A protein has these predicted regions:
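N-terminal secretory signal peptides that target proteins for export/translocation
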Residues: 1-5
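Pepsin/retropepsin-fold aspartyl endopeptidases
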Residues: 43, 47, 51, 65, ...
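Alpha-helical structural motif
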Residues: 10, 29, 451-453
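Bacterial N-terminal signal peptides
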Residues: 8-21
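N-terminal leader/linker segments that initiate helical-solenoid repeat arrays
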Residues: 22-65, 72
């Protein structure tokens, strides 16, 4: 059963009363670790908790505090190790199993995270960490209503803790109204959370509270805060196809898009979520007032953005209305901005790299086109999560989740995975360094660690038939820090698949309604390959 935001405010008030001077004497004296954690001094908290665990190995509380602190530091490998040890030692602790499930999720949906979450709630149906883990698992599977219920229940159980409120703010939940989002943001900000992933959620919460009036006034016809665009002609009753010639800049597909009657060239970006992003010099052509401010994020961190509203948009003959536009100071040559793939989430999108065209198909019978004569194809399911696409692949035999990003050129391994893949190889063939300078969207982070090696790896798309794509490990980067720990995804992404991987196919199809990815290829182009090879 859902609780109302007004009841949530009552819970917060009740918690505040519990901390009144009259009752404070009845509460146990907080430990040094707890005080450091509450103050946001996570480094000190880790030291205090580690010392407490060493001094009292049979005590559960300092172990739980240490795991929470490591998670806030986004030191998930150590958090996972501590959580596994705690769940093994304290088998009847719902907290230990719940935190272990969350650590497994952060590690990339690895292991038995569902089993651990279920074990937590079997021991205590109201366990905070078990509810959060169950909600995260439901969200990953697209069951937003179940996730919503879990996060509300967790927030009701511990209104003084920020994780539940934060998850409600980043949840893609169509039942959350702007008014409710504003109220939750106020509760969340009052708790003043520190560490991971709260820095980004705090930015989001401030954007919501500061701009609520503007959003309410200009997008009042929308039921939800996030999704404010809707097609004029859904085309769900019959099959409708439209082909458009796209201008490929290198391997990037540039779609012709009309906004308020003005032509724009937008890069089709499956990693761009549900945004229409215009570079500011191009956005000026629309002569639209800035309605509000928000933060947008990319490999360069975050940057502040203006929010605009356009009345109409057309993509390959498909019209849309009530268009939310965000702006960026970034620039890409010969383009006006980015078309987030989630805008076309009712369509089947086929990119033909030989004909240099894109085919958009709508309707109940829409699907990938049949392979051309002599071609083969494989179809893989993808997870559709916060507007981005993820497929499970293997790199040199290691299973992992890969982000599909048509807005990126190179396919990139994370530093963590690259180090694992290159372990034991001659050191003279491997170099590390730090790159500085502007990269893509975002302006808050201009440093990226990298590894350069003389070895290649392969991405295994499928086992039957065996299909591989080569990847150059010189393209490794710090995905662990710059991509994975976002407030929305918050799980380990080991591989970033850019257009350099897609163009090994003749055609690729993104079937958004059915969550399917189809690679059409010629036999020699995607063939079995041996293990890591020296170049």
């Amino acid at each position: 059963m859902l609780i109302s935001p007004f009841r949530a405010f009552a819970l917060i008030a009740l918690f505040s009363l519990c901390l009144s001077k009259a009752q404070a004497q009845l509460l146990p004296t907080p430990s040094a670790g707890e005080m450091a954690f509450a103050a946001g001094n996570l480094e000190s908290a880790q030291k205090f908790y580690s010392a407490a665990v060493k001094a009292a190995p049979e005590a559960l509380a300092p172990r739980l505090g240490l795991i929470r602190t490591l998670m806030r530091q986004d030191n998930w490998p150590e958090a996972l190790a501590e959580a596994q040890a705690a769940a093994l030692k304290f088998t009847t602790s719902a907290d230990a199993h719940g935190l272990l499930s969350l650590a497994l999720i952060r590690a990339g949906w690895s292991g038995e995270y569902i089993k651990e979450a279920a074990q937590s709630l079997a021991l205590d149906t109201n366990n905070y960490w078990g509810l959060l883990a169950t909600g995260r698992a439901a969200e990953w599977e697209g069951d937003y209503k179940a996730a919503h219920c879990c996060f509300w229940h967790a927030s009701e159980t511990h209104p003084e803790w920020p994780e539940g409120w934060g998850q409600l703010l980043v949840l893609e939940d169509d039942t959350l109204t702007l008014k409710e989002a504003t109220q939750i943001a106020a509760i969340y900000l009052k708790l003043d959370p520190h560490g991971h992933p709260h820095k980004e959620i705090v930015e989001n919460a401030r954007d919501i509270t500061e701009n609520a009036a503007a959003y309410q006034a200009f997008f009042s016809g929308s039921k939800t805060f996030q999704r404010i665009h809707s097609p004029l002609a859904p085309g769900t009753e019959s099959l409708q196809s439209s082909s458009t010639v796209v201008d490929f800049l290198g391997d990037f597909a540039i779609f012709p898009v009309t906004i308020n009657g003005q032509p724009f060239r937008l890069l089709f970006d499956t990693g761009g979520g549900d945004d229409i992003l215009l570079f500011w010099n191009s956005a000026k052509r629309l002569h639209l007032p800035s309605l509000a401010h928000t933060h947008i994020r990319g490999v360069g961190g975050s940057e502040k953005s203006d929010v605009l509203k356009a009345e109409s948009m057309e993509i390959a003959g498909v019209p849309f209305r009530s268009i939310k536009i965000v702006t960026a100071d970034s620039m890409l040559d010969k383009t006006d901005g980015i078309l987030g793939g989630n805008i076309l989430n009712d369509s089947v999108v086929t990119l033909d790299f030989e004909k240099r065209t894109a085919l958009l198909t709508n309707g109940a019978n829409a699907q990938a086109p049949d392979p051309l004569s002599g071609d083969k194809s494989i179809t893989l399911p993808f997870h559709y999560y916060h507007g981005c696409l993820y497929i499970q692949v293997a790199v040199n035999g290691q299973a992992l989740w890969a982000l599909l990003d048509t807005g990126a050129f190179r396919s990139t391994l994370s530093l963590r995975l690259a180090r694992e893949q290159l372990r034991g190889l001659p050191k003279e063939d491997i170099q590390t360094g730090t790159d500085t300078g502007k990269r893509g969207i975002g302006s808050s982070d201009n440093k990226m660690q990298y590894i350069v090696s003389r070895y290649e790896s392969q991405i295994q798309l499928s086992q039957n038939p065996p299909v591989y794509i080569p990847i150059d490990t010189a393209g490794t980067s710090d995905l662990d820090r710059q991509i994975s720990p976002s407030a929305q995804t918050d799980f380990e992404i080991s591989l970033w698949m850019g257009m350099s991987s897609f163009t090994y196919a003749r055609r690729i199809t993104f079937d958004y309604p059915r969550h399917l990815l189809t690679f059409e290829y010629k036999e020699p182009d995607l063939a079995p390959a041996p293990g890591p090879a020296k170049k």
